[in-house]
Regions:
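N-terminal hydrophobic/helix-forming segments and targeting peptides
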Residues: 1-466
Length: 466
């Protein structure tokens, strides 16, 4: 049951639609390298499409009815878009869910130090990373510094053409014999992933008893104060600054068929999900798109999928729509259908031994469906019902969407998980779906434009027809 390459069927008009979609996606990916920025961009997209903040609806005491469109944000890191359908909410929702946190390095709370006449920022990695990926590459600092007076300073240094960039040094090959003999996981110690941010000291009188003990670090702090209004080093205690690859997403391949960028996992699913949501109108079953944080570290915390944000927001909406009983809420959740959208491992001929080709995701063959994920005996996975898989197949076929079914590599080769099992706890039908990528969790991942286009088409069809 080999699936065909999606590119072979496209008309000139479809190629134009594909390129337009991917231009928007490249811009989104390049400009929004943190979960906060993704949510902010998602809110802008929603408001331009006529969505209203749920908090405004609640404050004004308005009722909700079919055709109303609302959004809710959670700590600036989660976003839920809701388009109310004509059917009673108790009959359930059609839900898309993706995450917008990506593997990265986070600054520690007390990060700044000086060594060897250079200023550094100490980091702690976030998510599943290979430490050796992060050395000798241009890096950017993106995030927020929250000050005690209640103001927030936005930090975004390294992505503009005239910005300085940062890096983590690597050991020169001439002195690397011991390093090169280590397993890859030990070649670069995660504790030494320290970002070089300066190499010039402030000027001072050597005899001045108040002269800074770390003059290069002081120069870095002085520039932060002058250019960003960060008054004191202690403001790092209440900061969330992420170290991410510097530079934009770009077309890849001489035929421009792919996109190389940071954060395809999982913004390559989040962006087409949001776009499908705002482009679907006059639905029967209420459509919901959920964009969440913390998936890469287990979906924990107030902004992870295990929080009550989704359930609480649904309860608010059902109450405003006149269906506010606890039983109606439980029925609505259990009767819902969901595509849990996350990336899949694209077949890589260079590492073919890690894949079983009958059930592998191939680049350019369309939207991926993973009936189950997990590892070593499907541990920790959601396993979609056969009846639900049949329903999803029917929706995709009737909409002419190219799709493929796949697993995350050979049996016992490894594995992974998504938010699917968390949503399935409500009793709803959930299946994992998404886009195949190469070099998953590396600084620069690869996605095929045809797969992004088919993902958008598939998500839109699901919201309209499920």
């Amino acid at each position: 049951m080999e699936r065909p390459c999606a590119w072979k069927k496209y008309t000139p008009q479809q190629i134009e639609e594909l390129e337009e979609l991917c231009r928007g996606y490249k811009h989104f990916l390049s400009e929004n390298k943190t979960e906060r920025l993704c949510v902010k961009a998602g809110i802008k997209m929603a408001e331009e499409a006529g969505y209203v903040d749920l908090e405004t609806v609640i404050a004004e005491g308005r009722e909700l009815k079919a055709g109303d469109k609302v959004y809710a944000a959670n700590h600036g890191k989660d976003l839920m878009l809701v388009n109310l359908g004509t059917a009673p909410l108790e009959q359930g929702f059609n839900i898309l869910g993706a995450h917008v946190d990506s593997p990265r390095l986070d600054l520690k709370q007390n990060p700044a130090f000086e060594a060897g006449d250079m200023a550094y920022l100490d980091t702690h990695y976030y998510g599943g990373v290979k430490s050796y990926h992060w050395v000798a590459s241009p890096l950017a600092l993106v995030g927020v510094i929250c000050k005690k007076d209640g103001t927030t300073v936005d930090i975004n240094i390294g992505d503009k053409a005239d910005d300085p960039v940062f890096t983590i040094s690597d050991l020169l090959i001439h002195l690397s014999s011991e390093q090169m003999s280590k397993p890859a996981k030990d070649a670069v110690d995660a504790e030494i992933l320290d970002v070089i941010v300066g190499g010039r000291p402030v000027k001072f009188d050597e005899d001045d008893k108040d002269a800074p003990k770390e003059p290069v670090k002081q120069m870095f702090l002085d520039i932060l104060k002058e250019q960003y209004g960060v008054e004191e080093e202690e403001d790092f205690l209440s900061a969330e600054i992420e170290v991410v690859p510097a530079g934009p997403a770009r077309d890849m391949g001489l035929d421009r068929s792919m996109i190389l960028g940071y954060g395809h996992d999982d913004r390559v699913c989040a962006y087409p999900s949001m776009l499908a949501q705002i482009n679907v109108t006059n639905v029967e079953r209420t459509s919901i798109t959920l964009i969440v944080d913390k998936e890469e570290i287990g979906s924990v915390g107030a902004t992870g999928m295990t929080s009550r944000f989704f359930e609480n927001t649904v309860a608010e909406i059902m109450t405003l729509a006149g269906e506010g009983s606890p039983l109606a809420l439980r029925r609505a959740l259990a009767r819902s259908r969901m595509l849990s959208s996350d990336v899949s491992a694209g077949f890589d001929p260079g590492y073919a031994a890690k894949f079983e080709t009958k059930n592998a995701a191939f680049m350019g063959r369309g939207l991926c469906f993973n009936k189950y994920t997990g590892s070593r005996g499907k541990g920790g996975s959601n396993d979609a019902d056969a009846e639900y898989v049949a329903l999803v197949r029917d929706i995709m076929d009737k909409a002419g969407v190219d799709f493929q079914t796949c697993e995350l590599g050979r049996v016992n080769a490894g594995g992974g998980g998504t938010i699917a099992y968390i949503m399935a706890k409500y009793g709803m039908n959930v299946i994992d779906s998404g886009v195949a990528v190469l070099s998953m969790h590396a600084l620069w991942e690869v996605a095929n434009k045809a797969d992004i286009y088919e993902a958008y088409r598939g998500y839109k069809a699901f919201l309209e027809r499920a």
